């Protein structure tokens, strides 16, 4: 598929298991309505006209993905993921073709809104380093004493943000930063942290707080509520 400088490739690392969900089924394959969480997450990306391809990195032993309609979608590419998220993202970047910019989106974050995605993608016109969707911290934050469930002190929440996805960067820059961070043993918790490690300062694009990641059992019902509400709003 031919690409232009405006075209974007999305990478979805989906090789994880998610033990906190307390289920034998990987969380991305749990269902909300008639689709899996992974399908909801990917369809939100495919809905934007600039996203020409989505690369999904799955576990080499994954037998579930082939059973989904996504497996035969013409804009979907599947690659083997790695042991860590960064390894899966790097595998996805290698299959991103000529796209100059890439989105990275959590497989278990199904409630992405199109207006948030559009504002994030607009960074390609104004930024050289990209940025992430994020939500300002609203709750009081506590720091625990080391090794204890006891409060050490209250953390000033001014300037604190919850990092969300998608995260959006120039493809070559993200590749180089992830590679360097992994080679030097840095702790990488998301793609932005790799750029931070290399001295860059990605932008924060405020996104909706209901763009939740399904991590624990109680998140499933909340995500279902948000998705049902969104579908109702779009149909009225």
Curated annotation (Swiss-Prot):
GO terms for molecular function: 2-C-methyl-D-erythritol 4-phosphate cytidylyltransferase activity. GO terms for biological process: isopentenyl diphosphate biosynthetic process, methylerythritol 4-phosphate pathway. Its EC number is 2.7.7.60. The record marks 20, 27 as: Transition state stabilizer. The record marks 157, 213 as: Positions MEP for the nucleophilic attack. PROSITE patterns: ISPD. It catalyses: 2-C-methyl-D-erythritol 4-phosphate + CTP + H(+) = 4-CDP-2-C-methyl-D-erythritol + diphosphate. Pathway: Isoprenoid biosynthesis; isopentenyl diphosphate biosynthesis via DXP pathway; isopentenyl diphosphate from 1-deoxy-D-xylulose 5-phosphate: step 2/6. Keywords: Isoprene biosynthesis, Nucleotidyltransferase, Transferase. Catalyzes the formation of 4-diphosphocytidyl-2-C-methyl-D-erythritol from CTP and 2-C-methyl-D-erythritol 4-phosphate (MEP). NCBIfam families: ispD (TIGR00453). Homodimer. HAMAP family: IspD (MF_00108). Belongs to the IspD/TarI cytidylyltransferase family. IspD subfamily. This is 2-C-methyl-D-erythritol 4-phosphate cytidylyltransferase. It comes from Escherichia coli O6:H1 (strain CFT073 / ATCC 700928 / UPEC). The gene is ispD.
């Amino acid at each position: 598929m031919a690409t232009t400088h405006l075209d974007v490739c999305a990478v979805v690392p989906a090789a994880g298991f998610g033990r906190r969900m307390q289920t034998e089924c990987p969380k991305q394959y749990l269902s909300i309505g008639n689709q899996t969480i992974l399908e909801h997450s990917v369809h939100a990306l495919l809905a934007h006209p600039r996203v020409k391809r989505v690369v999904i990195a799955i576990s080499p032993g994954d037998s579930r993905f082939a059973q989904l309609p996504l497996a035969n979608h013409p804009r979907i590419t599947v690659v083997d993921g790695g042991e860590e998220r960064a390894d899966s993202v790097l595998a996805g970047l290698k299959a991103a073709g000529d796209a100059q910019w890439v989105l990275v989106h959590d497989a278990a974050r199904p409630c992405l809104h199109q207006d948030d995605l559009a504002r994030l993608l607009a960074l390609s016109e104004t930024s050289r380093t990209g940025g992430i969707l994020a939500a300002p911290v609203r709750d009081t934050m506590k720091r625990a004493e080391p090794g204890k469930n006891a409060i050490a002190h209250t953390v000033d929440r001014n300037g604190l943000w919850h990092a969300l996805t998608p995260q959006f960067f120039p493809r070559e820059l993200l590749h180089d930063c992830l590679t360097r961070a992994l080679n030097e043993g840095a702790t990488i918790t998301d793609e932005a942290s790799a750029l931070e490690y290399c001295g860059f300062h990605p932008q924060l694009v405020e996104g909706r707080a209901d763009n939740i990641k399904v991590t624990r059992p109680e998140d499933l019902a909340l995500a279902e509520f948000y998705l049902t509400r969104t579908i109702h709003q779009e149909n009225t």
